[in-house]
């Protein structure tokens, strides 16, 4: 491709691909080297043998200058060679070299060892061409770099484990500065790594939030269990986050749990209903948990109720509305044994309380029996002793007392008379009589003999004075 000035703008210009055209256009430049050699040979005859060596040094210097210019000239690698893969299309050949550009190393540092040493004519021909076309080739190289950079795939290829691998990127510029591109790649890699770290942190936060919500759900389920609700079953995949395994239904129990060494009946009688007890506290219900794995049954009760240990039955006593303790405190769960014990205690108390009236009754009955015996003794006496005071009785002492238990008898025989006396209880089954005429204490038999046989002796006795008949009337009036 040629522009208006006839300059070639192909990629192979910097590598010497168009050497034929350069020779045709720059042919007048070749005779310049020959006059210099002739002048140097004409200056001295001794220098003619050294002319070939001087020409050789001049050519080697020209080649060194050419190599330095080619080193600084921009090289536009193909896309296949950029990624380290050999290109399929044949590139331009450098100065008759058999190897194409694609098979030659792309780095400029390796080009010096493999560049062939060309003749002086080729070096002289490429000098003005490389000098004149340096600026357009740099512009094209800059455009090519932007195109290849835009056509390149992402430098970060995701590996199988989710990480990011950095592709080896080294873009050589005309001044040999590859560090900027590498810095850009490293900054992009750091940005992608930070993005991955942020994604992992977000996922970790999400898992923490999920665990927190799972714990909250389990706490809510526990709170629902205390209310008596049935717990739902969870899938097995959720067991790792603190949830329940499938098929396990757990009813939350109360705090006071007592293991009993016997089977407790599943049904418990409900609390008694009180119609006239508005201020009475509700009775604590008894919950029974069925035995698990063939173990012991567990009885759970509220904290307000007492637990009876070691007894088979759990009963609630019936309440009496008229009792004094019915409205004071809530009833307690009692076993049959404790209820029986209390019944025995109350029975013994009743027996103890009943002993006192029995004793009192026994004493009264004994007194009644004594009275009956006394009456029986009086009845045995027959009609000889009668209650009351005889009309012609003679009193000794200060007078008579009509409120006393008076008795009277009539003596038998020719000397018999009517005497009176006061009875009193001398012993448990014994009654004595005090005669009014002498004041002598005697038994009923003695009292009867005194009335019949002792009448003459009474007249002769000085201890018992005789009272006139007028005293009887006064005593009767009193």
From Swiss-Prot:
Region of interest (Disordered), ranges: 1-247, 336-374, 454-478
Primary localisation category: nucleus
GO CC annotation: nucleus
Alphabetically ordered keywords of this record: Nucleus
GO biological process: jasmonic acid mediated signaling pathway; negative regulation of DNA-templated transcription
Ranges of biased composition (kind: Acidic residues): 180-189
Signal peptide: none
InterPro entries: Ninja_fam, Ninja_motif, TDBD
Composition skew (Polar residues), residue ranges: 169-179
Biased composition (Basic and acidic residues): 23-35, 339-359
Chain intervals with Low complexity compositional bias: 233-242
Protein location: Nucleus
PANTHER family given in the database record: AFP HOMOLOG 2 (PTHR31413:SF12)
Family named by the database record: Belongs to the Ninja family.
Protein name per the record: Ninja-family protein 7
Organism of derivation: Zea mays (Maize)
Lineage: Eukaryota, Viridiplantae, Streptophyta, Embryophyta, Tracheophyta
